[in-house]
Amino acid sequence: MEVMGTAAEMYHEGRRLHMKFGDVATIKVPCTREGLSVCKQLSDDGIKVNVTLIFCASQAVLAAKAGATYVSPFVGRLDDQSVAGLEVVRSISELYRIHGIRTQVLSASIRSVQRAIRSWYNGAEICTMPPKVFDQMYDHILTDKGMEIFENDWKGVQK
């Protein structure tokens, strides 16, 4: 649940949302000075925080140090700017591993199945994607052909 506004407004809205929805709520703040300040306050209060609009490893380190539960590097938007979004995910994941940081990497702005798989391969624990991309994860031509063979075999058994 994303919060916007001044640091004070974001903090109070985050607390309000947590009071209303409990621990199922994760409060989403931007990776700005104000957002990271709010992240620290909310995480100190025991509230899960996702720091979003991450575009480099240094931002992800600052977010983790502020107590972020999740960080969201925007792979698709980085790729749009000719920056290797998956390399940013890999760098963040590797830094977290080396330093024992428990913040989870959530690859955002995923626009293809291949980008999702490569995100997971590069250390992301979670990927967000449009429903169309998620649905494509089920599809494979060999599965379709296999189902056709199974169906024909089944019809042969029933005769």
Feature names for model-found ranges:
Residues M1-D45, V75:
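Active-site beta->alpha loop and helix N-cap motifs at the rims of alpha/beta catalytic domains
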Residues M1-V3, A25-V29, I47-T52, V71-P73, ...:
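Hydrophobic faces of well-ordered beta-strands that scaffold small-molecule active sites
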Residues E2-T6, P30-E34, I54-C56, G76, ...:
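Active-site beta-loop-alpha junctions enriched in small/polar residues
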Residues E9, E13-G14, V38, C56-A66, ...:
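Catalytic cores of alpha/beta
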Residues M19-F21, L36-V49, A84-V105, M147-K159:
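Alpha-helix-loop-beta-strand connector modules within alpha/beta enzyme cores
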Residues T52-L106:
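A contiguous pocket-lining binding segment that forms or flanks enzyme active sites
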